[in-house]
Amino acid sequence: MSTNPKPAFRRILLKLSGEALMGEEGFGIDPKVLDRMAQEIKELVELGIQVGVVIGGGNLFRGEGLAQAGMNRVVGDHMGMLATVMNGLAMRDALHRAYVNARLMSAIPLKGVCDDYNWAEAISLLKSGRVVIFAAGTGNPFCTTDSAACLRGIEIEAEVVLKGTKVDGVYSDDPVKNPEAVKYDEMGYGEVLEKELKVMDLAAFTLARDHDMPILVFNMNKPGALRRVIMGDHEGTLIRSSRKTAE
């Protein structure tokens, strides 16, 4: 039960990994997981939260892996972008089935499949209460979907980038391998870099830091965690500028 009557955030960018959609499966999309995530997003919409979503594509394709096997990295990344579009289509469909208005925008044109990304239109849709799913990353190779999440978050003026992962925050070490690893509740950008903690890739993280975009890492597989994050309850790890953490 939340101790805060009002949501802590009004406009968010939710970053989900493609792997999160797999559930217990080794590949693809688990329909049960997809529907549960759609229901959790629906709860936010009902609270009046404006929700942007970026989904990775690792459950369907990883360009980096095939690049190591000899495939051209640009080609591999283009295939990875298309994988995020497939995940976006699945999420849009799940949201529609949950009676949530959602729009899918792609950074690469896919006429007849989804809309082209348009910054002004995205903000207008968010203000009207629609969920906006941003697909195809940034539209450029060599850029991760974490970079896309931070970029879109900054563009739509989100108050925070929520990074849904398999662990419930940022730890001093891998909690799976080291049971004595310590979980951080709040950190500054500099502290994360100093400790070399792997929150997201460096390009994405420094983009967020340079534009003072807070990042909140939490466990998306934990039922109710997303709502608790939104309500400002102690959930996950919040990373923001050190001057704010000191206040």
From Swiss-Prot:
<feature type="binding site">
    <location>
        <position position="62"/>
    </location>
    <ligand>
        <name>ATP</name>
    </ligand>
</feature>
<dbReference type="InterPro" id="IPR001048">
    <property type="entry name" value="Asp/Glu/Uridylate_kinase"/>
</dbReference>
<keyword id="KW-0808">Transferase</keyword>
<feature type="region of interest" description="Involved in allosteric activation by GTP">
    <location>
        <begin position="23"/>
        <end position="28"/>
    </location>
</feature>
<comment type="pathway">
    <text>Pyrimidine metabolism; CTP biosynthesis via de novo pathway; UDP from UMP (UMPK route): step 1/1.</text>
</comment>
<feature type="binding site">
    <location>
        <position position="171"/>
    </location>
    <ligand>
        <name>ATP</name>
    </ligand>
</feature>
<keyword id="KW-0963">Cytoplasm</keyword>
<dbReference type="InterPro" id="IPR011817">
    <property type="entry name" value="Uridylate_kinase"/>
</dbReference>
<feature type="binding site">
    <location>
        <position position="77"/>
    </location>
    <ligand>
        <name>UMP</name>
    </ligand>
</feature>
<comment type="subunit">
    <text>Homohexamer.</text>
</comment>
<feature type="binding site">
    <location>
        <begin position="138"/>
        <end position="145"/>
    </location>
    <ligand>
        <name>UMP</name>
    </ligand>
</feature>
<feature type="binding site">
    <location>
        <position position="57"/>
    </location>
    <ligand>
        <name>UMP</name>
    </ligand>
</feature>
<dbReference type="GO" id="GO:0033862">
    <property type="term" value="F:UMP kinase activity"/>
</dbReference>
<dbReference type="InterPro" id="IPR036393">
    <property type="entry name" value="AceGlu_kinase-like_sf"/>
</dbReference>
<feature type="binding site">
    <location>
        <begin position="15"/>
        <end position="18"/>
    </location>
    <ligand>
        <name>ATP</name>
    </ligand>
</feature>
<dbReference type="GO" id="GO:0005524">
    <property type="term" value="F:ATP binding"/>
</dbReference>
<feature type="binding site">
    <location>
        <position position="165"/>
    </location>
    <ligand>
        <name>ATP</name>
    </ligand>
</feature>
<keyword id="KW-0021">Allosteric enzyme</keyword>
<dbReference type="Pfam" id="PF00696">
    <property type="entry name" value="AA_kinase"/>
</dbReference>
<dbReference type="GO" id="GO:0005829">
    <property type="term" value="C:cytosol"/>
</dbReference>
<keyword id="KW-0067">ATP-binding</keyword>
<comment type="function">
    <text>Catalyzes the reversible phosphorylation of UMP to UDP.</text>
</comment>
<dbReference type="GO" id="GO:0006225">
    <property type="term" value="P:UDP biosynthetic process"/>
</dbReference>
<protein>
    <recommendedName>
        <fullName>Uridylate kinase</fullName>
        <ecNumber>2.7.4.22</ecNumber>
    </recommendedName>
</protein>
<feature type="binding site">
    <location>
        <position position="58"/>
    </location>
    <ligand>
        <name>ATP</name>
    </ligand>
</feature>
<dbReference type="GO" id="GO:0044210">
    <property type="term" value="P:'de novo' CTP biosynthetic process"/>
</dbReference>
<feature type="binding site">
    <location>
        <position position="174"/>
    </location>
    <ligand>
        <name>ATP</name>
    </ligand>
</feature>
<keyword id="KW-0547">Nucleotide-binding</keyword>
<keyword id="KW-0418">Kinase</keyword>
<dbReference type="InterPro" id="IPR015963">
    <property type="entry name" value="Uridylate_kinase_bac"/>
</dbReference>
<keyword id="KW-0665">Pyrimidine biosynthesis</keyword>
<comment type="similarity">
    <text>Belongs to the UMP kinase family.</text>
</comment>
